[in-house]
Every structure is written in C-alpha cells, then in structure tokens.
Amino acid sequence: MVEASEGTLEPIGAVQRTLVGREATEPMRADIGLLGAILGDTVREQNGQQVFELVERARVESFRVRRSEIDRAELARMFAGIDIHQAIPVIRAFSHFALLANVAEDIHRERRRAIHVAAGEPPQDSSLAATYAKLDRAQLDSATVAEALRGAVVSPVITAHPTETRRRTVFVTQHRITELMRLHAEGHIETDDGRNIELELRRQVLTLWQTALIRLSRLQITDEIEVGLRYYAAAFFKVIPRVNAEVRNALRARWPGADLLDEPIVAPGSWIGGDRDGNPNVTADVVRRATGDAAYTALAHYLAELTACEQELSMSARLVAVTPELAALAEDCAEKARADEPYRRALRVIRGRLTATAAEILDRRPQHELDLGLPPYATPAELRGDLDTVDASLRAHGSALLADDRLALLREGVRVFGFHLCGLDMRQNSDVHEEVVAELLAWAGVHPDYRSLPEDERVELLAAELGTRRPLVGDRAELSELADKELGVVRAAAHAIRRYGPAAVPNYVISMCRSVSDVLEAAILLKEAGLIDASGPEPYCPVGISPLFETIEDLHNGAAILHAMLELPLYRALVAARGQSQEVMLGYSDSNKDGGYLASSWAVYRAELALVEVARKTGIRLRLFHGRGGTVGRGGGPSYEAILAQPPGAVNGSLRLTEQGEVIAAKYAEPQVAQRNLESLVAATLESTLLDVEGLGDTAEPAYAVLDEVAVLAQRAYAELVHETPGFVDYFMASTPVSEIGSLNIGSRPTSRKPTESIADLRAIPWVLAWSQSRVMLPGWYGTGSAFEQWIAAGPQSRAERVDILHDLYRRWPFFRSVLSNLAQVLAKSDLGLAAQYAELVDDAALRRRVFGKIADEHRRTIAMHKLITGQDNLLADNPALARSVFNRFPYLEPLNHLQVELLRRYRSGDDDELVQRGILLTMNGLTSALRNSG
C-alpha cells in the first residue's frame, strides 16, 4: 500500500486511514479511499487474486512513472502481450475507478459549498447570490432592467455524442452510489430504510462491476433519444422549475415595477433526433419518435405528480374553506367518493382531463391515467390555469406552505415544459438544401437549373416563391430519395407542432451557411410543410431560421449575410412575425478545426461584435446560439467564465448553448450539481446583460487590434502543421484512435460528413476526441505559443513592453483571461510522454519524427508563453480544484492509455477478436469519464 500524501492517491483495495495534506481535501480523499477499497475488494472477489494483483501492480507502477522513478517504457512493457482476458478486467477496474472518483469529486464540491454558506462567507462567484449582490450595487432602474430582460431565455440544448454510451442501468447505479455517498458525507451510517450505507455501497459497486458498461451493438438514434430524456427524471423536472421560480421572484422583488420574466428564463432544448447534418439515420419517423417521446415524458411526469398531489392534499371541507373557483373545479368530478375532500376531487378532474389530453396527442399510454370522460386540455396554459386555481385556494385559506411544495414545482414545470417537454431543433447542411430546392423548383417548372444561377438571381427567385401560398410539389410528386426524405422531416416537424404546440420544434439551423440564398432555401422547405406563409399581411412563421456560421471565413462574413437577410422585405416580415427576434448560431468546433484554438476564439468574438452592430442598426433583437462542445478545442470550458467573456451586447438577456456527451452527465446527472450549473448559466447571463463586464472601456479598440494580429499568427502556425505539413493526415490517422471511433460501435452518426480522410470533411467531435484519447489535446492549444512568441518579438516596442501589454490584457479583459485559462486546462490535461507512445503507432519513422517533433516543440513553447503572460509558474494556479483533480486522477489514466495503445496495435495488425475491439471501446469510455470533457 502506498502511503497517501498530497502527491499520491489511495490504492484501489485499501481504505486510507491517515489523512494528510490540505485539510479541505481530506473528506474527498477519504471518499475516494472508501470507494477505491470497495472496488478493489469487488475485483478480488469477482475476478480473483491474480487480476487484483495485476491491477494493483499497474497502479503502483503508474505512480512510479509519475514520480519519475521508472521509465514509461517499463509500464508499456508490462502490458505488451497481455492476455486479452486479463486486459479487459484491468481496463474495467480503472474505468470504474474514474467513474467513482467523479462521484467523490461532485460530493466534495457540494460539501465545500455547504461549508462556505454555513460559515457566513460572501457568496461565491457564479452563484445567483453573488450575482444579485452585484446587481444591487449597480442600482439599475426598472425600465433598463425590463428592456434588457424582455424575452430573456437561457437554453441548454442537449445534443447526442459518440462517447456518452453508458447504458441506463449504469446511469441509475451511479446515481444510487451518489445518493449513498451523499448520506455518508452527512455522517449517516444507515439509509432512511435502515440499510447499512457501506454494505449498500458494496452492493451497488458489485452491480456496477457485473453490468456491461457499453452496448455491444452500435448506438441507435432511439438510444440517444432515451439517453437525453433520462436527465429530466434525474434532475431537470425538479431543478429547472425551482431555478425559474427563484430567479423570477428575486428579480421581481428588486424591480417590482418591471414585470419581469413572464416566461421561464431556463428552457431546455434538444438536437437529438432533429440534427440530420451528415446523419442519414435522422428521418421523419425519428423526428416523430423524438418529439413523441419528449411529450410522453412530460405528460407522464405531470400525471405522476398529480397523483402524488392527490395523496398529499387530503384537506376536508369540514375543516378548511376553499375558493368558489376551486369548488367549481371540484364539482366536475362525478365520482361519489371523497365528497368532503375538494382538493382531491379538483386534482382528479385535472388528472382526468390530462389523461384525455394524453389519449389525444400521445401514441402510447402513460401510467397514473384516470379516465373520467372529461374533455382534454387544448393548451398547456389551460392546464396551468386549473393548477393555479388549486394554488390560489390554498393560499387564500392558510395553506401557502402546502402550495409552495410539490404543487409549486408542478405549476412551474407546466410553464416551462408544456406538452412538448423541450424544443427539438432541426439542422441540416446548406448543400443538402440547395440540392433539394433545385429539384423542387425543376419539378414545379419554376427553373430547370437553379444551381447554375448567381446569388442575386437565386435570392430573387426564392423570395418570389416565398411570397406565394402555393407549394412547389404535392404529396404525390415523384422525387428523389433525398428530396422525399427532407420533405418528410419538415412535415414531421409540422405534425409535432400541431400536436404538441409551436414550442415543440422552435428552430431550424442551417449548417455551413454562407449566403442569403442558403437561408431562403431552408425557408422554402419550411413553406412546403406549411411552416411558413408569407403571402399575406400577417406572415405565419412558428419556426425560426438560424444561420450557423462555422468556419473562420464564414464567421468573418456572418454580419454581412445577416444584414443582407434583413434587407429583404419578405424575410424582414418573417422576423417581425417572430417579435423582431433573430437567432444566429456560432460554430466553435469547425472554426477550431479550420483555424486552431486562438484564431477560432477570436473569430467568434469578432463575429459577435459585428452581429451585435447589425442588430443595433436594424432594430432587431439578436439571440446568439453557441455551438460549444465539451472540450476547449470545441468551444468548451467553464460556462460562467465563457459567458462573461462575451463582447458587449452579445448576450442581451438571452443565450442558447449546446451541451454534449459526458459533459451533460457531469453537469446534469445529479439534482444538486444540475442546479448549480443552471444557476451559473443564469447568473452569467444576468451579469453579462445588465453589467459592464468587458472591462476595457476606451482601450477596447487597441486590445482588439492586438488580438487581430495574434490570431493571424496563430492561424498561420496551425495551418502550417495541420493543412500544409506533408503526411499530416497519415500521422493523425495512425497516431490516434480516430479510425476506430468510426469502425467501432460508437454513436449513430458517421465520423465524417463525406467518405474521405480529409480533415475538412472529418467531424469536429472525432477530431477532438481522437487527440484527447492520445493525450495531445492538440485542438485546444496548437499555434498559440508560436503566435504569442512571434507577436512579442515583432512589434516596435521592446520585448518587455509587449509582454506587459499582454499581461495587462490578461488582468483586465475577461475574454483574454478566459482564453488563457482554458488553454491552461488543456495543457494540464495533455501528456506528451503518453502521446509519444501513440506516435509509435506511426510506421513511417521520418514522418513520426517530423510531426511529433513539431507538436512537442509547440507544446513547450505554449507552456512557456502562458507562464510569461500570466506570471504563473503553475498552469492551474488559478484553479486549485482542477489542479487537485488532475493531480489525483491522472496516475489512474496511465494504464488505460497504455492498454489502448497495445490493443490498437493488435487490432491494426489484424487481430479482430471481439474482445480486442471491446477493450479499445472500454479504454475510450474510461478515458472519457476520467477527463470529463474529452470529445
């Protein structure tokens, strides 16, 4: 057993008895020790002493590598030739430990926040309490706040992800372990039903060990839909209504004259089942399944909660009075039972009408139905009205305490989830729209060769078509398979809107949008499904069209495209029909793959500035949708800091952002963690909207000029490696598991948009995931070191003066500070020693030396530049929590990386044993869980 210290971690299989190191981390280390001990015991009992000793030996040797006591090659030799039947349990052991360590870290964060609050210390940044204090100090007037927060919305949009393949069984078991560890952290020995907590933990870990972590078959879209919906029962149904009510009440208390937030501020969305960009598996049936399952989830939840409310609100008319409205509602219950229990009778009426609603709009029947022969609710507002009647009666007769419990959450839930649960966005590539619209125009005899037209003639033709009511084709038109499929999808969306309301499919996103005609082509498809009618004086447009600007060039051109869109009278009328609101989506992933981290980050910032200016000049309300991935290489990083780093006017009360894969699980799988993360999003949105957070003042333009220059240098350095180095694609394909990401059973979507090995056609997720698995993390930092080094050396000022300029920007500018903070996180998680092991998978020695040499040189250069600009010797000096997490868990990743390299070598040498393939997939999932934002 290795003695625990700040430099080591508890061994799997041995409880840490003596806690040392910083006092604040001792409880977390004890939790990790307990879970590690239970896991170790389970491995020994289930797989034998030999496997346990192999796991322990791997752990010990990994620590020796980290302390530079042995060369990494020794650990690699330990796994060379390992029997696959021994390799699998070793991989599973370290993967499970990563999962359990995540639980311990999450519990510890909750514990530290509770201690912080109990000690009466000032609220922490990113909390709503801290934000309210800042708003109080700003002394804002009601009119300013009312205008700024008009139509405010914070929308995390759940998307599918190829590495989030955990089965529901694993998800539920992990949740149970978290609940048990929370009780343990509170000092309990037994659960509420008298079970010994440690014994129950052992049961759950045993269940986890005996449950397959991953599916044997490729993940289907229906699986991904189920994965996305599980977060509602796990957290969203409780947390989102609570956050919405708390924020509305807090803001109205401060500005009672502003009449704030009539609509919920937090409103979730989804792409799962609607995003068909490069995914041929998304069809009309899938759209119907996604929207139908979402509606089922919402109504099933309401029926269950109404049943629980019935049981709880048992008040007798002999003891309490009720309002006339409540009495009238209860009278609609024809049942003779419960004659003196008006609240129960009223709630049964509501449940009966909701049962009728479910029968009318759902394709399957939920539990807790009650058929009373009553009419269905026409809208969620009608349901909410009846719930408000119950609430008002309770409050009017001394029962506010009861009204503020389950009923309050249900009322808020109906406000935000409606009958649709969450808005499903549609997304498709502009090239597909162009091909389909050209076919429709030719079929209708409008133009035989639309694709040959120049842009101005395209716009003129499309605008004319949108101004007519007639469709281009009928249901019986003989079209290509692609056109039939695309029309089927938008018609399925129209069906969902008719069934579940306009919020069911609120947006249509156009990938790779490069022109006004790209926007109008999408509008034509929506018109064919009856979702746009611009022929009359009051246009109908329930679905907003969101251009997505993804590449560096498209981000540069985005504002001009938006301005041209708004110059078209017909399109401007559609925007007016949607309350003068226009959404624009910004792509972090493809712009990063296109130009590198720094160039991409700055291109997005510049695009936002320009888009905000267009919105100001044209009088529209702009909402930006951030296509952020989990990793820094795909726009990820701490959301609070990222939102505060937005330019002035970019947030404007509203924000949408994608949440993906293992990041969803890390943020939203547990109610306490979910509440903290949602509050953080709202807090940052309020601050960015109502306060001056940029902090540059009159020095903004000189600061922008500096980043203009640095971004050009960064993009040049990145392009020199990724786009111009001969053999780079071959190196990438060989030195990372990118090929296996596509060939193994990961995700429903192909890894490339087209069947090529081009970096341009490769999707951003496998691009980033592959570099993360190999521990290079290249998309999150490459080119940045060279750019800063060259900029410092190139100017008219002295080197010291140039460094001072950058340091001053780091100190004063949230955007620049966020860029360098995210950069540091990626560098801290990278490991060029392990990356060298992956480089050995490249057969061409000269290519290996050339490319890896450039990567290693730039890595050293980037770390040096970060230190120079920030003045921090430690990459994570400003993030001690992450520093401890990285330090504690990384020795446990070492075996996973070495085993992945070993199994990749075997697989590529022709060993197609199913266990070898499964082992590779297990290492991917283990590393993903441990890194928590790897793809």
UniProtKB/Swiss-Prot annotation:
Keyword Lyase found: yes
Names of the cofactor(s): Mg(2+)
Alphabetized UniProt keyword annotations: Carbon dioxide fixation, Lyase, Magnesium
EC numbers, comma separated: 4.1.1.31
GO CC, alphabetical: cytosol
Record keyword Thylakoid present: no
Gene3D superfamilies given in the database record: Phosphoenolpyruvate/pyruvate domain
EC supergroup of this enzyme: lyase
One record GO biological process: tricarboxylic acid cycle
Catalytic activity: oxaloacetate + phosphate = phosphoenolpyruvate + hydrogencarbonate
GO MF assignments: magnesium ion binding; phosphoenolpyruvate carboxylase activity
Catalytic residues, chain numbering: H161, K593
Residues that span the membrane, as ranges: none
UniProt similarity note: Belongs to the PEPCase type 1 family.
Family matches, as PANTHER family: PHOSPHOENOLPYRUVATE CARBOXYLASE
Alphabetized NCBIfam families for the sequence: PRK00009.1
Biological role: Forms oxaloacetate, a four-carbon dicarboxylic acid source for the tricarboxylic acid cycle.
Protein name in the entry: Phosphoenolpyruvate carboxylase
Organism phylogeny: Bacteria, Bacillati, Actinomycetota, Actinomycetes, Mycobacteriales
